[in-house]
UniProtKB/Swiss-Prot annotation:
Keywords: Ribonucleoprotein, Ribosomal protein, RNA-binding, rRNA-binding. NCBIfam families: rplT_bact (TIGR01032). This is Large ribosomal subunit protein bL20. GO terms for molecular function: rRNA binding; structural constituent of ribosome. InterPro entries: Ribosomal_bL20, RIBOSOMAL_L20_CS, Ribosomal_protein_bL20_C. Belongs to the bacterial ribosomal protein bL20 family. It comes from Dehalococcoides mccartyi (strain ATCC BAA-2100 / JCM 16839 / KCTC 5957 / BAV1). Gene3D superfamilies: 6.10.160.10, Ribosomal protein L20.
Amino acid sequence: MARIKGGLATHKRHKKVLALTKGHASTRHSLFKRAHESMVHAMSYAFAHRRARKGDMRRLWITRINAAARAEGLTYGELISGLKVAGIDINRKVLADMAISDTVAFAAVAAKAAAAKAN
């Protein structure tokens, strides 16, 4: 039986790796061995950072809410505590969006939270 070297499959795999590393620096986009290492690391970072993005976005929302709350005379913690006491169930993503795009509505929500906190 003749030996099969698998040249076509290898060539396709190499082309795929080199296509994925297009834009990488130096030999990381042209030499297969270096490109493969670069691709594995890049994919690993992409996987980890897709998960890290969730926390990053939450931190951004909290920062925005805190800034808007301070403009209304409350701290972030006081606002969130007041919302819980008032029974207003709005998540941080919506609150942050409201703080940027609809400041009047955010001010009304902050006023209700402050009133609930005062009682």
